[in-house]
Structures are given as structure tokens and as C-alpha cells.
Design a protein with these regions (language model features):
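Beta-strand-dominated extracellular/periplasmic modules and repeats
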Residues: 11-96, 100, 107-109
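Single conserved hydrophobic/aromatic residue that forms the stacking wall/gate
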Residues: 1-10
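Compositionally biased low-complexity segments at domain edges in trafficked proteins
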Residues: 102-123
């Protein structure tokens, strides 16, 4: 989520893996909000062919102690997979997480299928 240098962008990103297809979930829109106090959108991206963002979602003065929310718009992604319901079970996946030390590495991946999801604090 945070990058202090361009070379760190790949290492410090959220990413999304489609556990139904066994592939990176390319093309999913992801928004990030700060939710410490008033909820405010900070950034938005579309995941690339590797299921990753090409840019840091949080960096510089935006990356500070507080609570954040990632919103993955998975409904549009699953609507485009043949033989799945036209109305997806999951439309948006929201992950709320806290940053207690902005000097540490924060990586929040999403593993998602049409019916379930999981996340963890990655390395």
C-alpha cells in the first residue's frame, strides 16, 4: 500500500487473486479510503494483468497512523465469467484495517471467489 520509492511499488501493493479460476484478478477497481474521523476517498486504481496496482495506493503524507478501508469492486469481474450467476453473490468486498506504524510494511491482499473471500497482512 505504501511506497517510498518507485522500485517499492511492486512490493508494497494490494493484490487480488481469483481462487475460483486460479488466476490473478485483473481489471478489478479498488478504492482506498481513510476512515479515521470522516470517511474520505484517497485513491483509486484498476488492477493489472497480475492482479496488482501499477501505483502505490498510499504514499507520502497520505500514509500515516490511522484506519483505512480498501473496497474491491468484484461484482463486475465475476459478471464477466461464463456460467456464473448474472447477479453476483459478492458485489463489493470491503477490508478495514489499521496502520499503527507507518514505517512498517503493509500489504493487504485479497483472495476471492464468487462466494467467499479472505485476507491477511502480507509480508
Amino acid at each position: 500500500l505504501y511506497s517510498s520509492a518507485a522500485s517499492d511499488v511492486y512490493k508494497r501493493q494490494t493484490h487480488c487473486l481469483d481462487t475460483f479460476s486460479g488466476k490473478p484478478a485483473k481489471g478489478i477497481k479498488v478504492d482506498i479510503y481513510t476512515v479515521s474521523g470522516k470517511k474520505e476517498k484517497i485513491n483509486s486504481t484498476i488492477l493489472n494483468n497480475n492482479g496488482r496496482s501499477d501505483k502505490a495506493l498510499l504514499e507520502g503524507s497520505n500514509f500515516k497512523e490511522g484506519e483505512y478501508e480498501l473496497v474491491f469492486f468484484v461484482g463486475d469481474y465475476f459478471r464477466n465469467i461464463p456460467n456464473l450467476p448474472k447477479i453476483p453473490f459478492l458485489n463489493e468486498v470491503t477490508i478495514r484495517f489499521g496502520v499503527s506504524n507507518p514505517k512498517e510494511h503493509y500489504h493487504v491482499p485479497l483472495l476471492v471467489s464468487p462466494w467467499s473471500y479472505s485476507t491477511y497482512r502480507g509480508s
